[in-house]
């Protein structure tokens, strides 16, 4: 079967060899404003939008996610579980002509799988890259992005509730003592949230989403050169 590779609004025919995968987390507390699957929804939104605007193939989502042992705000898997799922997606992607894979990751703990990417490249003889787009957990940036996407319940009352760090210790990781003690970056971010609180900024959310999608598009353009 001769496929019409030039059809549609695509960058060029080479883009059909690029596959985009969304990576996030499904089971994580995000305060009162955001749902537990916020990270994978943001990753999917960005990845799918970039796919639509370029013609690259959106291959779907990775269901498992991983996290540092000292960050306790959800239910996660081992890095090896994420690796195994990526193996499945890459193996299936190769069958439809994908030669280069771009993982859009929107969950900080998943950076633990980056060390496996070279193994995937070697095993399948493909290119595998990962873009990390992450925010201070359940804080102003993530709340604002979620609001623009339509997944945040950010009315005045709920936002006030969200800022109760005793009830929602995962917000900004302010109340996650073990995480703050073990990770300086987490502690610094938590201090900012403690000082300024979590606010809704629609313009900021729109700006972050656009910049994130543009970042993925630029990477796709780079991969087809």
UniProtKB/Swiss-Prot annotation:
The keyword Iron applies. The gene is arfB. GO terms for molecular function: 2-amino-5-formylamino-6-(5-phosphoribosylamino)pyrimidin-4(3H)-one formate-lyase activity; ferrous iron binding. It comes from Methanocaldococcus sp. (strain FS406-22). Catalyzes the hydrolysis of the formamide of 2-amino-5-formylamino-6-ribosylamino-4(3H)-pyrimidinone 5'-monophosphate (FAPy) to form 2,5-diamino-6-ribosylamino-4(3H)-pyrimidinone 5'-phosphate (APy). Fe cation 1 binds at residues 28, 39, 107. It comes from the Archaea. The lineage of its organism: Archaea, Methanobacteriati, Methanobacteriota, Methanomada group, Methanococci. This is 2-amino-5-formylamino-6-ribosylaminopyrimidin-4(3H)-one 5'-monophosphate deformylase. Its EC number is 3.5.1.102.
């Amino acid at each position: 079967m001769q496929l019409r590779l030039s059809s549609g609004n695509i960058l060029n025919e080479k883009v059909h060899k690029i596959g985009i995968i969304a990576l996030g987390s499904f089971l994580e507390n995000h305060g009162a404003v955001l749902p537990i699957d916020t990270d994978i929804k943001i990753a999917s939104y960005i990845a799918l939008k970039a796919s639509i605007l370029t013609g690259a193939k959106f291959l779907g989502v990775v269901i498992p996610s991983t996290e540092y042992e000292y960050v306790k705000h959800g239910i996660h898997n081992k890095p090896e579980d994420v690796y195994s799922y990526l193996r499945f997606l890459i193996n299936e992607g190769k069958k439809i002509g994908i030669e280069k894979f771009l993982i859009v990751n929107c969950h900080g703990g998943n950076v633990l799988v980056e060390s496996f990417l070279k193994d995937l490249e070697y095993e399948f003889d493909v290119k595998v890259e990962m873009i990390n787009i992450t925010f201070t957990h359940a804080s102003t940036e993530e709340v604002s992005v979620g609001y623009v996407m339509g997944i945040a319940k950010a009315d005045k009352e709920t936002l006030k509730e969200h800022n109760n760090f005793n009830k929602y210790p995962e917000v900004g990781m302010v109340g996650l003592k073990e995480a703050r003690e073990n990770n300086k970056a987490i502690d610094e971010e938590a201090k900012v949230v403690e000082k300024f609180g979590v606010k809704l900024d629609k313009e900021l959310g729109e700006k972050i989403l656009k910049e994130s999608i543009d970042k993925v598009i630029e990477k796709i353009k780079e991969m087809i050169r």
